[in-house]
Amino acid sequence: FDLLGLLKKVVSGL
């Protein structure tokens, strides 16, 4: 599970 990758995806979706 890529937590940092998921976080970046969420941030870029804002």
Swiss-Prot record:
GO terms for cellular component: extracellular region; membrane; other organism cell membrane. The keyword ATP-binding does not apply. It comes from the Eukaryota. Expressed by the venom gland. The keyword Secreted applies. It is found in: Secreted; Target cell membrane. The modification Leucine amide is found at L14. Keywords: Amidation, Membrane, Secreted, Target cell membrane, Target membrane. Antimicrobial peptide with activity against Gram-negative and Gram-positive bacteria, as well as against fungi. Has potent hemolytic activity against erythrocytes. Belongs to the MCD family. Mastoparan subfamily. This is Eumenine mastoparan-EM3. It comes from Eumenes micado (Potter wasp). The lineage of its organism: Eukaryota, Metazoa, Ecdysozoa, Arthropoda, Hexapoda.
